[in-house]
Amino acid sequence: MADQSTRPIAIFTAGTAASGKSTALRSTEWAGLPVVDPDRFKPLHPEYDPRAPELVHEWSKVEASKLRRKYLTDGVTHVVDGTGAKAASFCARIEEARAAGFSIKVLWVQCDLRVALKRNAARERSVKPEVVRGQAKTIPFTMAIATDIVDEVRVVDTNPKQTFEEWLYQNTDTNEY
Protein backbone atom coordinates (compact mmCIF):
# COMPACT_ATOMS: atom_id res chain seq x y z
CA MET A 1 0.00 0.00 0.00
CA ALA A 2 1.22 3.52 -0.77
CA ASP A 3 2.61 5.73 1.96
CA GLN A 4 -0.36 7.43 3.64
CA SER A 5 1.14 10.87 2.98
CA THR A 6 1.07 10.28 -0.79
CA ARG A 7 -2.35 8.64 -0.98
CA PRO A 8 -5.41 10.66 -1.97
CA ILE A 9 -7.67 11.52 0.95
CA ALA A 10 -11.42 11.11 1.36
CA ILE A 11 -12.78 13.31 4.14
CA PHE A 12 -16.22 12.36 5.43
CA THR A 13 -18.28 14.85 7.40
CA ALA A 14 -20.61 13.76 10.16
CA GLY A 15 -23.06 15.76 12.23
CA THR A 16 -26.74 16.57 12.37
CA ALA A 17 -28.42 18.84 9.89
CA ALA A 18 -27.55 22.43 10.87
CA SER A 19 -24.69 21.34 13.13
CA GLY A 20 -22.30 23.59 11.21
CA LYS A 21 -20.50 21.05 9.02
CA SER A 22 -19.91 23.46 6.12
CA THR A 23 -18.72 26.23 8.43
CA ALA A 24 -16.40 23.85 10.30
CA LEU A 25 -15.01 22.50 7.03
CA ARG A 26 -14.13 26.04 5.89
CA SER A 27 -11.91 26.42 8.98
CA THR A 28 -9.77 23.38 8.12
CA GLU A 29 -6.95 22.72 5.67
CA TRP A 30 -9.58 20.84 3.64
CA ALA A 31 -11.42 24.06 2.72
CA GLY A 32 -11.52 24.45 -1.04
CA LEU A 33 -11.44 20.73 -1.82
CA PRO A 34 -14.11 19.33 -4.13
CA VAL A 35 -17.20 18.46 -2.07
CA VAL A 36 -19.62 15.66 -2.84
CA ASP A 37 -22.89 16.87 -1.35
CA PRO A 38 -26.39 15.71 -2.33
CA ASP A 39 -27.70 19.13 -1.25
CA ARG A 40 -25.72 20.79 -4.04
CA PHE A 41 -27.64 18.73 -6.60
CA LYS A 42 -31.14 19.38 -5.20
CA PRO A 43 -31.62 22.86 -6.76
CA LEU A 44 -30.89 21.30 -10.16
CA HIS A 45 -34.01 19.13 -9.95
CA PRO A 46 -37.07 20.69 -11.64
CA GLU A 47 -39.33 19.75 -8.70
CA TYR A 48 -37.03 21.08 -5.97
CA ASP A 49 -38.69 23.01 -3.14
CA PRO A 50 -36.32 24.35 -0.45
CA ARG A 51 -39.09 23.91 2.12
CA ALA A 52 -39.34 20.20 1.26
CA PRO A 53 -35.85 19.07 0.18
CA GLU A 54 -36.63 15.49 1.18
CA LEU A 55 -38.80 15.18 -1.96
CA VAL A 56 -35.71 15.10 -4.19
CA HIS A 57 -33.24 13.64 -1.70
CA GLU A 58 -33.04 10.15 -3.22
CA TRP A 59 -32.39 11.63 -6.68
CA SER A 60 -29.70 13.95 -5.32
CA LYS A 61 -28.03 11.05 -3.47
CA VAL A 62 -27.76 9.12 -6.75
CA GLU A 63 -26.20 12.12 -8.51
CA ALA A 64 -23.77 12.71 -5.65
CA SER A 65 -22.83 9.02 -5.65
CA LYS A 66 -21.89 9.23 -9.34
CA LEU A 67 -19.57 12.15 -8.61
CA ARG A 68 -18.07 10.41 -5.55
CA ARG A 69 -17.30 7.29 -7.59
CA LYS A 70 -15.66 9.42 -10.30
CA TYR A 71 -13.39 11.01 -7.68
CA LEU A 72 -12.52 7.54 -6.35
CA THR A 73 -11.72 6.26 -9.84
CA ASP A 74 -9.65 9.34 -10.68
CA GLY A 75 -7.83 9.43 -7.30
CA VAL A 76 -9.10 12.93 -6.45
CA THR A 77 -8.82 14.06 -2.82
CA HIS A 78 -12.31 15.18 -1.85
CA VAL A 79 -14.87 15.73 0.90
CA VAL A 80 -18.01 13.61 1.21
CA ASP A 81 -20.63 15.72 2.96
CA GLY A 82 -23.09 13.76 5.04
CA THR A 83 -24.54 13.31 8.48
CA GLY A 84 -23.31 9.84 9.38
CA ALA A 85 -26.79 9.05 10.65
CA LYS A 86 -26.90 5.67 8.90
CA ALA A 87 -23.96 3.56 10.04
CA ALA A 88 -24.18 0.93 7.31
CA SER A 89 -24.07 3.35 4.37
CA PHE A 90 -21.52 5.66 6.04
CA CYS A 91 -19.15 2.77 6.72
CA ALA A 92 -19.74 1.24 3.27
CA ARG A 93 -18.66 4.51 1.60
CA ILE A 94 -15.59 4.59 3.84
CA GLU A 95 -14.69 1.01 2.91
CA GLU A 96 -15.22 1.81 -0.78
CA ALA A 97 -12.79 4.73 -0.53
CA ARG A 98 -10.30 2.62 1.42
CA ALA A 99 -10.48 -0.11 -1.27
CA ALA A 100 -9.74 2.57 -3.89
CA GLY A 101 -6.50 3.40 -2.06
CA PHE A 102 -7.61 6.50 -0.16
CA SER A 103 -6.58 7.64 3.28
CA ILE A 104 -9.77 8.20 5.31
CA LYS A 105 -10.51 11.10 7.64
CA VAL A 106 -13.72 12.10 9.41
CA LEU A 107 -14.73 15.61 10.43
CA TRP A 108 -17.30 15.02 13.19
CA VAL A 109 -19.15 18.27 13.88
CA GLN A 110 -20.98 18.36 17.18
CA CYS A 111 -23.46 20.76 18.70
CA ASP A 112 -26.29 20.52 21.19
CA LEU A 113 -29.57 19.28 19.77
CA ARG A 114 -31.33 22.50 20.77
CA VAL A 115 -28.73 24.52 18.86
CA ALA A 116 -29.11 22.36 15.74
CA LEU A 117 -32.91 22.58 15.91
CA LYS A 118 -32.78 26.37 16.25
CA ARG A 119 -30.34 26.72 13.34
CA ASN A 120 -32.41 24.33 11.25
CA ALA A 121 -35.62 26.28 11.88
CA ALA A 122 -33.91 29.50 10.74
CA ARG A 123 -32.86 28.01 7.39
CA GLU A 124 -34.77 28.29 4.16
CA ARG A 125 -33.66 24.76 3.30
CA SER A 126 -34.59 22.92 6.46
CA VAL A 127 -35.33 19.35 7.38
CA LYS A 128 -38.06 18.14 9.67
CA PRO A 129 -37.18 18.50 13.38
CA GLU A 130 -37.82 14.80 13.98
CA VAL A 131 -35.14 14.01 11.37
CA VAL A 132 -32.60 16.15 13.25
CA ARG A 133 -33.58 14.44 16.52
CA GLY A 134 -33.14 11.02 14.92
CA GLN A 135 -29.73 11.99 13.56
CA ALA A 136 -28.64 13.15 17.01
CA LYS A 137 -29.47 9.70 18.38
CA THR A 138 -27.76 7.59 15.70
CA ILE A 139 -24.62 9.56 14.81
CA PRO A 140 -22.72 8.66 18.02
CA PHE A 141 -23.33 4.97 17.24
CA THR A 142 -22.00 5.43 13.71
CA MET A 143 -18.93 7.25 14.99
CA ALA A 144 -18.23 4.48 17.51
CA ILE A 145 -18.02 2.06 14.59
CA ALA A 146 -16.26 4.39 12.14
CA THR A 147 -13.49 5.25 14.59
CA ASP A 148 -12.08 1.76 14.08
CA ILE A 149 -11.99 1.94 10.27
CA VAL A 150 -10.61 5.43 9.57
CA ASP A 151 -7.18 7.01 9.82
CA GLU A 152 -8.29 10.11 11.71
CA VAL A 153 -11.39 11.50 13.42
CA ARG A 154 -11.39 15.23 14.05
CA VAL A 155 -14.10 16.51 16.40
CA VAL A 156 -15.27 20.12 16.14
CA ASP A 157 -17.70 21.69 18.62
CA THR A 158 -19.86 24.37 16.97
CA ASN A 159 -21.92 25.34 19.99
CA PRO A 160 -22.06 29.08 20.51
CA LYS A 161 -19.62 30.29 23.13
CA GLN A 162 -21.54 31.53 26.15
CA THR A 163 -21.31 31.95 29.89
CA PHE A 164 -22.75 29.35 32.21
CA GLU A 165 -25.58 31.75 33.11
CA GLU A 166 -26.48 32.21 29.43
CA TRP A 167 -26.42 28.45 28.89
CA LEU A 168 -28.55 27.84 31.98
CA TYR A 169 -31.12 30.43 30.88
CA GLN A 170 -31.36 28.97 27.37
CA ASN A 171 -31.51 25.36 28.55
CA THR A 172 -33.92 25.67 31.44
CA ASP A 173 -37.61 25.38 30.78
CA THR A 174 -39.17 27.74 33.31
CA ASN A 175 -42.49 25.95 32.84
CA GLU A 176 -40.99 22.94 34.61
CA TYR A 177 -40.80 24.76 37.96
Feature annotation, model-predicted:
Residues 4-11, 19, 30, 114-177:
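Conserved GTP-binding G-domain of TRAFAC-class P-loop NTPases and closely related GTPase folds
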Residues 22-78, 88:
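Conserved substrate/cofactor phosphate-moiety recognition/catalytic segment
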Residues 33-35, 106, 153-155:
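Conserved beta-strand scaffold positions in the cores of enzyme catalytic domains, especially
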Residues 78-83, 106:
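Short catalytic-loop micro-motif centered on adjacent basic/acidic residues
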Residues 81-90, 113:
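Acidic, metal-coordinating catalytic cores used for nucleic-acid/nucleotide bond scission
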Residues 86-103:
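Short, electropositive alpha-helical surface patch
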Residues 98-119:
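Conserved phosphate-donor/acceptor-positioning beta-strand/loop module used by diverse small-molecule
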